[in-house]
Amino acid sequence: MALRVLLLTALTLCHGFNLDTENAMTFQENARGFGQSVVQLQGSRVVVGAPQEIVAANQRGSLYQCDYSTGSCEPIRLQVPVEAVNMSLGLSLAATTSPPQLLACGPTVHQTCSENTYVKGLCFLFGSNLRQQPQKFPEALRGCPQEDSDIAFLIDGSGSIIPHDFRRMKEFVSTVMEQLKKSKTLFSLMQYSEEFRIHFTFKEFQNNPNPRSLVKPITQLLGRTHTATGIRKVVRELFNITNGARKNAFKILVVITDGEKFGDPLGYEDVIPEADREGVIRYVIGVGDAFRSEKSRQELNTIASKPPRDHVFQVNNFEALKTIQNQLREKIFAIEGTQTGSSSSFEHEMSQEGFSAAITSNGPLLSTVGSYDWAGGVFLYTSKEKSTFINMTRVDSDMNDAYLGYAAAIILRNRVQSLVLGAPRYQHIGLVAMFRQNTGMWESNANVKGTQIGAYFGASLCSVDVDSNGSTDLVLIGAPHYYEQTRGGQVSVCPLPRGRARWQCDAVLYGEQGQPWGRFGAALTVLGDVNGDKLTDVAIGAPGEEDNRGAVYLFHGTSGSGISPSHSQRIAGSKLSPRLQYFGQSLSGGQDLTMDGLVDLTVGAQGHVLLLRSQPVLRVKAIMEFNPREVARNVFECNDQVVKGKEAGEVRVCLHVQKSTRDRLREGQIQSVVTYDLALDSGRPHSRAVFNETKNSTRRQTQVLGLTQTCETLKLQLPNCIEDPVSPIVLRLNFSLVGTPLSAFGNLRPVLAEDAQRLFTALFPFEKNCGNDNICQDDLSITFSFMSLDCLVVGGPREFNVTVTVRNDGEDSYRTQVTFFFPLDLSYRKVSTLQNQRSQRSWRLACESASSTEVSGALKSTSCSINHPIFPENSEVTFNITFDVDSKASLGNKLLLKANVTSENNMPRTNKTEFQLELPVKYAVYMVVTSHGVSTKYLNFTASENTSRVMQHQYQVSNLGQRSLPISLVFLVPVRLNQTVIWDRPQVTFSENLSSTCHTKERLPSHSDFLAELRKAPVVNCSIAVCQRIQCDIPFFGIQEEFNATLKGNLSFDWYIKTSHNHLLIVSTAEILFNDSVFTLLPGQGAFVRSQTETKVEPFEVPNPLPLIVGSSVGGLLLLALITAALYKLGFFKRQYKDMMSEGGPPGAEPQ
C-alpha cells in the first residue's frame, strides 16, 4: 500500500488566529475512506479510520497509526473475528488519555439469519500499546431471532361478495402465501360467513405446501358476516397443536372482510382480549366502500393489533388487493424480529452497534442507532459480559426513526459522569437528551429539541469545560443540515441546566455567509487553550463549504463559561491544497503531538489527514514616561520676545514582549520583529510638540526583540506658541509584530495575541497657573440685559440682542462656558464681542445649540465657550448674543431668559454664576378696514319731497397678519342734526356667518353751532351731529380672514332745510379695536385700522314745461312761413311742362 507524507506550505496564508497554516503536515493514504474519522493519542500519534477500505473478502475497514515524529503512517494489525463481515472498521473512534485507551468501532457487521440479513456492530478497546490485541465489545454477536411463523387467513365468504371478487381474494391469498413461503413458515385458512369452514390446517399445509392447490378448490359459503365468532374459532381451533400449530412460532392472523359484522352473537370485546392473551398478531384488510364511515373504520382498528396504523389496510375494491401485497409481506417479515405484546418491531437486529462511541469511567459506551425500529439507544459496558441498554422508548413512545445515539458525549458535573445523546431524526427536527444514573438506573433528566425539519440537530456533540475546572460547562450541538439561504449548518451553544431548570441553548454559531451547503457543525472537537487566556477553545468542521473542499473554524472560549459568537480563524481546505476534498469531515484536538507544549488540531479530509499546530502567543507591554512630568510655563507661555523651538523635556519609551501560552519553548529562542510608530498630538491638525531628532511629530522604529524589555529616550520640542495649554500633549504608540520562525521547532512562528493591546497613549500635561496649592479656584459671575428693548414684539423684527457680561475675579478658569436656556420658539443666531474697559485683548467665543430640559418644561439651550481653554484671572468679557424669534411663536406675556456660567474648575455654584431676566411680550397684528365701492355715493331730492331714501355704507375688514385674535368693530353714524333725524335707525349686517354681539349708544356732538361748522366744511359728521356708536364684538378673527360689514338705514331730508348749502357730505366711520395689552400694531399701521365712507346729498328744482312747449310751437310756425315765401319768390312752385315738351323732337319720333 502506497504511503506518502507531504509537508504543505500554503501559497497564501489563512488569515486568523492562531493555528499555523504555513507548515501543515499532511498524512495521505490510498485506502478508501481514509480520514473519515480521526483521533489523537498521547505522544505524537494519530489514529485514522479508513472504514471503506476492502482488506479481504467479507472484511471492510482498517485503522492507521500516523506519527508526527516519523512523518509516516502504518496500519494497525488486528485479528478481525470471522463473524465481523464488512464491519466498516474505523467508522467511529474514541480515545482517552487517563488511562490511555482507544476505542475503534465497525457498526456495519452483516449477520445473515436464514433469508434475512441484519446489521450489527463490533468495537475494539485498545490500551496504550496498539500492537497488543484489544478487547472486543460485545464479546459475541447476538444470535439470530426466532423465525418460525404460523400464519392463518380468515377470509370473508358472506353473500355481499360477488363470485368474481371472491376469486380475486383467493388469488391474493395464494400470492401472499407464495411470497411468505419459506422453510419455517406454515399456513392455514378458514372461511366464514354465518357458517365456518376450515379449508386447510397448518398440519395439512405442511403435508402439501402448495398454496394454489390448497386455495383454488375453495367455494364461497354465502350468508351473513360473523367476524367476531370467526376470530374466536381461529384462535381456539387453528392455533391449536392438534392442527399443527407450533408452540414457539409467531401466531399471525390475516383477516379479509368487505363489511361490518352482521348478526354475530359475539362482540369484539368477547374475542379480542383472548387473542391478545394467546399472542396472536392480527392484520385486517378492509375492502370496499363499506369502510368509509367512522364507525366501520373503528371496527377495523378494533380487530387489528396495536398500533392500528401498522396493522390495518384499506382498499377500495378486491382488484386493489394486489397493491398491498408487498406492504403486507414487509409487515410480516418485520415480525420475525422480536415480538412485544400484541405488536412487533425490531429490537437489536439492525442496531449498528458502535455507530458512535465514547469511553466512560465505567467502560465503553456504544450507540445502537437501529435498535427498536431505529429509535436508537446505547449500550454501556461495565465488563465484557455485563452491559446496560439505555434508551428513551419507555418514556417517549414516538421515538421511531429517531436515531438516538447518532452522536454521544460524556459530561462531568461534581465528579459524576452523565451522558448526552443525539437523536437527529426525532420527529424530523432532532433531539438531544441528557441521561444520569439514579439508583442504578439510567434515566433522561433533560432534553433540548431542534427547530428546523431535516436540520439533523444532534448529529454531532461536544462537551466543553470552558474554564478548565474539571466540570463541564456547556454542550455544543451540531445541526449540519440546517438551511438558510446564504449558509448551511449551525452549532447551538447549550449551557448545562442548573437544578430542575429547563435545558436551553442561549447562542448559535454559524459559518461564513455564501455557503448554503457548507454542513457547518458536521464535526466538533475541544481544542484546548490556544490563545493563552486560560479558556478552552473549540474547532468546528464545515466539510461542504466551497463545493465540498471544506473548511475548519476556530472559536475561542469567553469568560462566563461561554463561546465567542464570532470565529477567530477560518481555515479553508483549498488554501492548504487544491486537492483536498471534505476538509473538516472529522476533527480531533487537545493533545500536544509536536512536543512543543502547544496543543494541536488534527483534521480529516477525503484520503488525507492534516496536522495543524497552534502557535506561541505573544503580548507587548509599552511604558512611556516624561521628564519632567509637566511642560513648564516659561516654556509654553508666549511674550513679546518669544523664542521658538524651546525644549520641552524628554520621554522614555520601553517595550516588553511577553509570552502568553504555556509551552516548552525556551525564552531565548523566541524573537520577533517589532515596528512601532510614535505620534505627538496625532488628532490635531498642527502638533504642539515635535521630536528633536526628526523635527517632526511622528517617528517610526523597527527592532528585533526577544522576551526582554528594550528602552530608548527621545527629546521633545515646542516649535510654536501654544494656544491650548490645557489639553495635555498626547503621545500615541502603535505597533506591529511579526514572529521569527523557530527552526528547531519546524519553523513554528510566534504570533501576536488577537486581543492584544496595540495602541498605547501617554499624556504630557502643561503646568497650571493655580497658585501654591496647584488647585485653580475661579470666581465667575454673569449678568445680561436686553439693552434698550422694552418689549419683545413677536411678528415684528425677527432678531433681538442680549448683552452679556462674564467676569472672573479668581484664578484661571478652565473651559469656561456660558449656557442660555430659552423657549423652543427662539433660536440662536450669532454671537459678537464688544470691547470693554477692563481689557483690550481679543476673545475667542464659540457657541452651539442643543436641546435641553428644565423642570419648568421643555427648553432649548445654547452653550458658548469663553476663550477656550483658559479664561484668565481678573478678566471680563462683554458680548452680544443674537436670538431669532419665530413669527408664529407663542411665548405668553413674558419671555424668561436664563443663563449660567460654569467651568472645569468644578467650583460650587453661587448666585453670581446664574442669572435670569424677564421681558414683556406682545404679538404683532396686521388688519385693514376699507370703504367698499358698493356704498351709496350720491343722493338728491326736491324741496317739496317729504319721503326718505335708503342709504348704505359698506366696509371690508381683512386680517392680513399671522395671528388670530378677538376684535371689536366700532361704527360712528350721524343720526340727528339739531333734533332732526338724519339717518334713521341704521343697522349693521355682516357678509359672513360671523359670531358677533353688537350694542349701541348715542354720542353728542363736540360743536353746538353746526351752521358755523358747515360754513367751514360742508360735512355732516359726529362733530356737529348726534351720532350712534355701534360696537360689534367678534370673538375670533382668523388668519387671512375677511368679511364685509354694512350700515343700512333711511336717510331723511327734513334736516336739510335748516342748512343753506347746495350740497353736503354724510360721513360714517369704522375702526378696529383689540386688546393692546396682548397685541400691537407695527409702526405705520395705525391708519389701516380706521376708515370712513361719504355720501353726497344735494337738492334740486323741478322745471315747468308749458311755456317752453308754447314758445317752441309759435316759433316753428313762423319759421315755416318764411321758408315757404322764399321758395315762392324763387319760382319753385311754377309749372314748366310745356317748356319741356317744346325742347323735345318731332312728333312721332322714337325716343333716343
UniProtKB/Swiss-Prot annotation:
Predominantly expressed in monocytes and granulocytes. Expressed in neutrophils (at protein level). It is found in: Cell membrane; Membrane raft. GO terms for biological process: amyloid-beta clearance; cell adhesion; cell adhesion mediated by integrin; cell-cell adhesion; cell-cell adhesion via plasma-membrane adhesion molecules; cell-matrix adhesion; complement receptor mediated signaling pathway; complement-mediated synapse pruning. It comes from the Eukaryota. Residues 17-1104 are extracellular. One of its GO terms (cellular component) is tertiary granule membrane. It is a single-pass type I membrane protein. One of its GO terms (molecular function) is integrin binding. Residues 150-328 form the VWFA domain. A motif (GFFKR motif) lies at residues 1131-1135. The chain crosses the membrane at residues 1105-1128. Ca(2+) 2 binds at residues 529, 531, 533, 537. Glycans are attached at residues 86, 240, 391, 469, 692, 696, 734, 801, 880, 900, 911, 940, 946, 978, 993, 1021, 1044, 1050, 1075. CDD domains: vWA_integrins_alpha_subunit. Heterodimer of an alpha and a beta subunit. ITGAM associates with ITGB2. Found in a complex with CD177 and ITGB2/CD18. Interacts with JAM3. Interacts with THBD. Interacts with complement factor H/CFH; this interaction mediates adhesion of neutrophils to pathogens leading to pathogen clearance. Interacts with TMEM268; this interaction inhibits ITGAM degradation via the endosome-lysosome pathway. The integrin I-domain (insert) is a VWFA domain. Integrins with I-domains do not undergo protease cleavage. Integrin ITGAM/ITGB2 is implicated in various adhesive interactions of monocytes, macrophages and granulocytes as well as in mediating the uptake of complement-coated particles and pathogens. It is identical with CR-3, the receptor for the iC3b fragment of the third complement component. It probably recognizes the R-G-D peptide in C3b. Integrin ITGAM/ITGB2 is also a receptor for fibrinogen, factor X and ICAM1. It recognizes P1 and P2 peptides of fibrinogen gamma chain. Regulates neutrophil migration. This is Integrin alpha-M. It comes from Homo sapiens. The gene is ITGAM.
